[in-house]
Structures are given as structure tokens and as C-alpha cells.
């Protein structure tokens, strides 16, 4: 059974299709829910590992339906999320003569999705992109909402564009080959939604015996977790597509999280691990400022630990360097570092007035 979640964004509206084996049903989903046709050449952008597992399924299904699709295989890893790597997509688009009616299919995790979306936003001033996320993090976050981009040496996602996909196809079966560490990273984003938007999701996660392994989760409950997480992202994005206000709430845990990723050269901590530490830090800031209760912060910490995610800053990280990186964050407003702080389970708020000394004290304490 395929669950459809509409993303209502006016002329940029689309659907999220969640269900087993949907990767092989891609042509039927495209025909039913998008205006896209196989008339123009297309690219499938992926990385070697994902292509080895699922490339044949997706390319075969599209080819059988009449699509002219060529793979574009990029190196795996956040450190390759750069303009130089995106140029490889442009080169493939040029060699395959992609035109304005062409489509880019993003088959991979958040890195592939972000780069493919950015390439689609900028090639010929914008062509269609279809997201086929293969990591939990991409399924519940990166593939939804139209944020695309690449990193700059001075900060994460500083170069980018908003470009909504025409369709998001989520096949939970592909998570069978996802490394456990990457599954846990995705669970950080799921917990985020529970903390700042969906109290029912938070309570559902609290009742589950384990959050660190897909195999330990009953399939029906896991689909419910997926659906509620996607719906949370849709609820926010549909109210604020371009992050003029409310959508910034989705950056909970990301202010410090992005700085942690950057200072570790995108190798020492993955995105979810960095966000988990960022949520712990934001929770402590919220308690210190009187916005949140210590009991709620403890409940958040319990979920993060249940997902076997880190809660402290690695001892060899330079906290003063972290503080400097925060000033380059794209969320800085009038030189004030913007934080998303929880006010209750399922609720959060934007805060631009967090004292710098409190941030410093909190980071040093989390490293102790």
C-alpha cells in the first residue's frame, strides 16, 4: 500500500509517495502524479554504493517505460558536496543534451539530493527534479521542501537555491542496506520533529523500545514514524516555503550542529550526530533562559540516547573555533546567532537574543 502526502505549494505543489517497492513503481507514479514525460533525455544522479544496490531497479523501470536515462555517478560523502562536484552533473547534462523538458532523478541520500536539486535549479535556469531518497535522513528531511545547495569552506549550505521536486518517492525497503550509523543519523531529524512540532510523534518515539536500528522497529510503527515525520516537514514548508519565518523552526539543533560538522571537516561527525549534540545544546540554552523545563530536556536527552546518538562535544574539538564558525552560519541575523529553542514538547520558537557568554559556557560544559 502506498501512502500519498500532498505538499500544497500552489503551482509548485507535489506529492510524497511512501510505500514498499515504490522505486520499481516510479514510472506509474510519475504518470499519475506529475506532468513529466519520457520525451526528453534524463539523468539519474547517484553514488557508487547506492547505484550498486538500486540503480538497476530504477533505471530498468524507467527505461522499460520509455525514458532515456543515463547514470551520473558521483563520489559519496559530505566532503564532496561542492560546486566542483556539481560541475560533473553539468558535464553529464551537456554530454547527454539535456533540455528544459528534461528531468534529473536524485537516487541517494541527502548529499546526492541536495546537489542534484541544485543542479536542476541552475541548469538552463531550472529543470525538473525527482527525489528518490535512500537514507532515513533524506526521507524525512532533505528530500522534502525544495532546499538545495552545496557547502563552502567557510560553512555548510551557504551556496544554494529553493527548487521544489516534482515528486518524492520513499521506499522503506532501501533502508535494509543503510549502515546502522546512518540510520541513527536520520533518527536525529525524526526526534527533532517530535521536540519542536509534533508531540504525538515524540510520545510514539518514547514508547518504542529502541530507536537505533530499523530491524528493532515493528514495520507498521516505523511507517507511522516515517509518515508523521514527513507530514511535520510538509506542515511547516507549506506555511513558509522560503524560510521567511516559521520554516526556520526546522533548524532546531542545526545552528551548533552545522558548526560541529564543519569543524570536523564533515568526517568526524555526520549530520545527524552533529544535530543531536546541537539539540542537547539548544535544550540546555532553553532551560537556562527559562523557556523550557529541565524535565522536558531530560526527556529529549533520553530519546537521543535511545537512538545511540552522541550528547557531548568531542574532547579534541576547539570550542572557540566553534564559536567563530557560528558567526558564519547562514541563519545569523544582524550579527546575532539565531537559535531555535523549544518551549514545550511539540513547540519551539526562534530566538536571536541568546547571550554569547551563555553559548560559550554551554559549549564548554558539553565538552567536559
Swiss-Prot record:
Coiled-coil parts of chain: none
Superkingdom, taxonomy of origin: Bacteria
Residues that, per the record, bind Zn(2+): 189, 254, 271
Subcellular localization(s) per the UniProt record: Cytoplasm
SUPFAM superfamilies named among the record's database cross-references: Dehydroquinate synthase-like
Residue ranges of the TM segments: none
Its EC number(s): 4.2.3.4
GO biological process: amino acid biosynthetic process; aromatic amino acid family biosynthetic process; chorismate biosynthetic process
Cofactors required: NAD(+); Co(2+); Zn(2+)
Reactions that this protein is recorded to catalyse: 7-phospho-2-dehydro-3-deoxy-D-arabino-heptonate = 3-dehydroquinate + phosphate
CDD domains per UniProt: DHQS
Free-text remark on how the cofactor is bound: Binds 1 divalent metal cation per subunit. Can use either Co(2+) or Zn(2+).
Protein family (similarity comment): Belongs to the sugar phosphate cyclases superfamily. Dehydroquinate synthase family.
HAMAP family reported for this sequence: DHQ_synthase (MF_00110)
Descriptive protein name: 3-dehydroquinate synthase
Organism field: Thermosynechococcus vestitus (strain NIES-2133 / IAM M-273 / BP-1)
Lineage, highest ranks first: Bacteria, Bacillati, Cyanobacteriota, Cyanophyceae, Acaryochloridales
Gene: aroB
Amino acid at each position: 500500500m502506498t501512502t500519498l502526502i500532498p505538499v500544497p505549494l500552489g503551482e509548485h505543489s507535489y506529492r510524497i509517495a511512501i510505500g514498499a517497492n515504490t522505486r520499481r513503481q516510479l514510472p506509474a507514479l510519475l504518470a499519475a502524479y506529475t506532468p513529466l514525460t519520457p520525451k526528453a533525455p534524463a539523468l539519474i544522479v547517484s553514488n557508487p554504493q547506492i547505484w550498486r544496490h538500486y540503480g538497476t531497479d530504477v533505471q530498468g523501470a524507467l527505461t522499460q517505460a520509455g525514458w532515456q536515462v543515463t547514470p551520473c555517478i558521483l563520489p559519496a560523502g559530505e566532503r564532496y558536496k561542492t560546486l566542483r562536484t556539481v560541475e560533473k552533473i553539468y558535464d553529464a547534462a551537456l554530454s547527454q543534451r539535456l533540455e528544459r523538458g528534461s528531468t534529473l532523478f536524485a537516487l541517494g541520500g541527502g548529499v546526492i539530493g541536495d546537489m542534484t536539486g541544485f543542479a536542476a535549479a541552475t541548469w538552463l535556469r531550472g529543470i525538473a527534479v525527482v527525489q528518490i531518497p535512500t537514507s532515513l535522513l533524506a526521507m524525512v528531511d532533505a528530500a522534502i521542501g525544495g532546499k538545495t545547495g552545496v557547502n563552502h569552506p567557510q560553512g555548510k549550505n551557504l551556496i544554494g537555491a529553493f527548487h521544489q521536486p516534482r515528486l518524492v518517492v520513499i521506499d522503506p525497503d532501501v533502508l535494509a542496506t543503510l549502515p546502522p550509523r546512518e540510520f541513527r543519523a536520520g533518527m536525529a531529524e525524526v526526534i527533532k520533529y517530535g521536540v519542536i512540532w509534533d508531540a504525538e510523534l515524540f510520545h510514539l518515539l518514547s514508547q518504542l523500545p529502541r530507536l537505533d536500528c530499523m530491524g528493532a522497529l515493528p514495520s507498521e510503527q516505523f511507517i507511522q514514524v516515517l509518515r508523521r515525520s514527513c507530514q511535520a516537514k510538509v506542515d511547516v514548508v507549506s506555511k513558509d516555503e522560503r524560510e521567511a519565518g516559521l520554516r526556520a523552526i526546522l533548524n532546531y539543533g542545526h545552528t551548533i550542529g552545522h558548526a560541529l560538522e564543519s569543524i570536523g571537516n564533515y568526517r568526524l561527525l555526520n549530520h545527524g550526530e552533529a544535530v543531536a549534540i546541537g539539540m542537547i545544546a539548544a535544550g540546555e540554552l532553553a532551560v537556562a533562559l527559562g523557556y523550557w523545563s529541565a524535565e522536558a530536556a531530560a526527556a529529549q536527552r533520553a530519546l537521543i540516547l535511545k537512538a545511540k546518538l552522541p550528547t557531548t562535544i568531542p574532547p579534541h574539538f576547539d570550542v572557540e573555533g566553534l564559536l567563530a564558525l557560528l558567526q558564519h552560519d547562514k541563519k545569523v541575523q544582524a550579527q546575532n546567532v539565531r537559535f531555535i529553542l523549544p518551549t514545550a514538547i511539540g513547540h519551539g520558537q526562534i530566538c536571536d537574543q541568546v547571550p554569547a557568554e551563555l553559548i560559550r559556557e554551554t559549549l564548554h560544559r558539553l565538552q567536559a
